[in-house]
């Protein structure tokens, strides 16, 4: 039984109540009684509106389901379909042109194009690593990944391999030639660096040369000409630091004494309370809120053991350089600018219950997140004894990503919630900024109206292919069987979706004011492929794109040196490359021409993916992890990948492509494979052979067999219920 404290109409879990009063409120000048009275009022006032928005989702889905069922044997008449969506209020009139007016936004969002990390906030070590990933070693990123092939004697090995190291150095020199070229010759020919009359000079066998664009020299550290110093360069607003130490192990092997090239990498990071975490009760939520508080105060730390040594990981300090003329000082952020992703409007959490007559109802988690992540983020706006040594925003803003909103009314509700939270916290109106995830179909087709609803708060829009595909399938569940998962990336609607997001953002004045973002690279070990392919996102006009690790952030940062995103956006400005009809094109299989082995392959692939993710979520509370696929390729999985896999199989089941027996047989085939892939985890509990005793196995089965009944195809209700069962069992056994 949860120990609770009464606060007006609310009964708050003591663990949350004590955290707020003892840890979060001190240093904010907010009176505890006033705060809890404010929380009570916000929850009481906004809960009915939240419920109404969810009822509207269900109402629209029921109307769409009925429309498709009445026409299931007919080819889709796109004009009739569009008119129907207008008639029921799903597709809304497009607003007149407007420009966003958001103010007080940090440069990392308005002007600097670069990678964006997303990391589960419940894991302090991951969170610290991500916050510190503002700067990363290019040498380490190249040496430790498949960007440098392990051929011709260039294997990684257990100790430093000079052959591989030389290839790393050559690759980095080629990068410098493209990002900060010399006025003649190549960085590969460099034999030394110096600063003369405030200008960088690079010595070569043919004499000394400067940069082709001298203004790209931004500063230096250390004593000029000393054995250990560095040179700071800048290109497209991103910094490059060349570390020079001829006496270091790597510097000894380099003609110019260069020991590393460090890139400004994860310019922004999203600390995630949503799809990458498993937070089902007050204890889980407080763990996340406490880590978010520590990040904002700057005092979060974690004991880390590595290579037999233990050390304390803390947040990095800012970086200071001498200006090129030797007279001034330049300070650059040492940490990523932090967003926090709250949960969406759907789920409730028993961390707080609301008394409603004789009933007690769990409070909407999205309302709680806005209140408590907003409160704890106040400490990131100032420094002092009670607020910690570091700041997050330098412009007085708190950046909240809001996911899974369906249409402009839900965006407007979030803005109303943020305004009410600002009143409770005594913050100026407009302090809480919103990042809009364009990952639900009703938001995509009404994106301009969604942005207008948040025109004075919006700081980013972002496409999310996986969740968006999950909603695409669920919205049109009754229309017929969908194409295979791997074919989704080549559909008409996907290209239209990605292009429209950029076009609409630019038309609303995002250039120089807000981020336009694109999705995650999930194949964590395939960095060579990422370096080859992910450049397409800045080329498409995106000022940021998601990466799964600090190493990936450093490698992806190169793309923003190769591509001038600002110039791309100028080229795209004023263009409208898509139609609403393209966005509404449903990815139906034109004919069911799959061979039995193709169907089995698709079912097995999806069942393995579902089991591999769900077993860690339900049994261990791990919301984001590298999950090997059926071919043992490590993929970064979260609830978005689960949603698309489960919804596709639910769709095939609904239309008779597969049977319940096929699903069960595949799950039973794949469970031993997943068990084997987790064999090295001492805490892992196998699903086979007692499948029906495994709550994780049953959760995976539920997600598929009841997938058509899940609200908008979301996986959270089943995951939360099964995870709570696991925790209850553990509590009983203790």
UniProtKB/Swiss-Prot annotation:
Glyoxylate binds at residues 341, 439, 464-467. InterPro entries: Malate_synth_C_sf (IPR044856), Malate_synth_sf (IPR011076), Malate_synthase_TIM (IPR001465), Malate_synthG (IPR006253), MS_C (IPR048355), MS_N (IPR048356), MS_N_TIM-barrel_dom (IPR046363), MSG_insertion (IPR048357). The keyword Transferase applies. It catalyses: glyoxylate + acetyl-CoA + H2O = (S)-malate + CoA + H(+). Its cofactor is Mg(2+). One of its GO terms (cellular component) is cytosol. The modification Cysteine sulfenic acid (-SOH) is found at residue 624. Its EC number is 2.3.3.9. The active site is at residues 341, 638. Monomer. Belongs to the malate synthase family. GlcB subfamily. This is Malate synthase G. It comes from Mycobacterium avium (strain 104). The lineage of its organism: Bacteria, Bacillati, Actinomycetota, Actinomycetes, Mycobacteriales.
């Amino acid at each position: 039984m949860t120990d609770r404290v009464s606060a007006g109409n609310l009964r708050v879990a003591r663990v949350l109540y004590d955290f707020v009063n003892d840890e979060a409120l001190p240093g904010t000048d907010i009176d505890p009684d006033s705060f809890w009275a404010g929380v009570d009022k916000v929850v009481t006032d906004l809960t009915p509106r939240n419920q109404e928005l969810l009822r509207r989702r269900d109402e629209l889905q029921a109307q769409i389901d009925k429309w498709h069922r009445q026409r299931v044997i007919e080819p889709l008449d796109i004009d009739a379909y569009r008119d129907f969506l207008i008639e029921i209020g799903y597709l809304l009139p497009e607003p007149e042109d407007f420009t966003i007016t958001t103010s007080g936004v940090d440069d990392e969002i308005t002007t600097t194009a670069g990678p964006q990390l997303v990391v589960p906030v419940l894991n302090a070590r991951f969170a610290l690593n991500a916050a510190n990933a503002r700067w990363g070693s290019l040498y380490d990123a190249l040496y430790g990944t498949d960007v440098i092939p392990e051929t011709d004697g260039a294997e990684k090995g257990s100790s430093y391999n000079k052959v591989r190291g030389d290839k790393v150095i050559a690759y980095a020199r080629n990068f410098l030639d493209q990002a900060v070229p010399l006025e003649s010759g190549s960085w590969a020919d460099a034999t030394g660096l110096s600063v003369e009359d405030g200008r960088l000079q690079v010595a070569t066998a043919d004499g000394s040369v400067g940069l082709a664009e001298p203004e790209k020299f931004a500063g230096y550290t250390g004593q000029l000409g000393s054995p250990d110093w560095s040179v700071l360069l800048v290109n497209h607003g991103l910094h490059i630091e060349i570390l020079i130490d001829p006496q270091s192990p790597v510097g000894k092997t380099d003609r110019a004494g260069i020991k590393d090239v460090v890139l400004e990498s994860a310019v922004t990071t999203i600390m995630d309370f949503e799809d990458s975490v498993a937070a089902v009760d007050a204890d889980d939520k407080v763990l996340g809120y406490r880590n978010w508080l520590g990040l904002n105060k700057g005092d979060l730390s974690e004991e880390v053991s590595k290579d037999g040594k233990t050390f304390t990981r803390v947040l990095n300090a800012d970086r200071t350089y001498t200006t090129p003329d030797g007279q001034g000082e330049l300070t650059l952020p040492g940490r990523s600018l932090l967003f926090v992703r709250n949960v969406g409007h759907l789920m409730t959490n028993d961390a707080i219950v609301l008394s409603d007559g004789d009933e007690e109802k769990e409070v909407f988690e999205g309302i709680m997140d806005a209140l408590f992540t907003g409160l704890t983020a106040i400490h990131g706006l100032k420094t002092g004894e009670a607020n910690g040594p570091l700041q997050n925003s330098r412009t007085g803003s708190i950046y909240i990503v809001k996911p899974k909103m369906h249409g402009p009314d839900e965006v407007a509700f979030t803005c109303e919630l943020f305004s009410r939270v600002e009143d409770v916290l005594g913050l100026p109106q407009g302090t809480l900024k919103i990042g809009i995830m364009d990952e639900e179909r009703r938001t995509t087709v009404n994106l301009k109206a969604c942005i207008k609803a948040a025109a004075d708060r919006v700081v980013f829009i972002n496409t999310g292919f996986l969740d968006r595909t999950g909603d695409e399938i669920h919205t049109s569940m009754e229309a017929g069987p969908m194409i295979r998962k791997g074919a989704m990336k080549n559909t008409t609607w996907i290209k239209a979706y990605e292009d429209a997001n950029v076009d609409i953002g630019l038309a609303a004045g995002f250039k120089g004011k807000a981020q336009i973002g694109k999705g995650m690279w999930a194949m964590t070990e395939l960095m060579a492929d990422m370096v080859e392919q992910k450049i397409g996102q800045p080329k498409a006009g995106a000022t940021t794109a998601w990466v799964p690790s600090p190493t990936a952030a450093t490698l992806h940062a190169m793309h923003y040196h190769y591509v001038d995103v600002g110039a791309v956006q100028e080229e795209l400005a004023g263009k409208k490359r898509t139609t609403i009809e393209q966005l509404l094109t449903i990815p139906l299989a034109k004919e069911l021409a799959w061979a039995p082995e193709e169907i089995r392959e698709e079912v097995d692939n999806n069942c393995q993916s579902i089991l591999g993710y769900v077993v860690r979520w339900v049994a261990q509370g791990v919301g984001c992890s590298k999950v090997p696929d059926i071919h043992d390729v490590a993929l970064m999985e979260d609830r978005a990948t689960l949603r698309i896999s489960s919804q596709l199989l639910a769709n095939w089941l609904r239309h008779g492509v597969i049977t319940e027996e096929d699903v069960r047989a595949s799950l039973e085939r794949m469970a031993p494979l997943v068990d084997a892939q987790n064999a090295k985890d001492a805490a892992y509990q196998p699903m086979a052979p007692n499948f029906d005793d495994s709550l994780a196995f049953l959760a995976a089965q539920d997600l598929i067999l009841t997938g058509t009944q899940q609200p908008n195809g979301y996986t959270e209700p089943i995951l939360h219920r099964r995870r709570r069962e696991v925790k209850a069992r553990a509590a009983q056994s203790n």
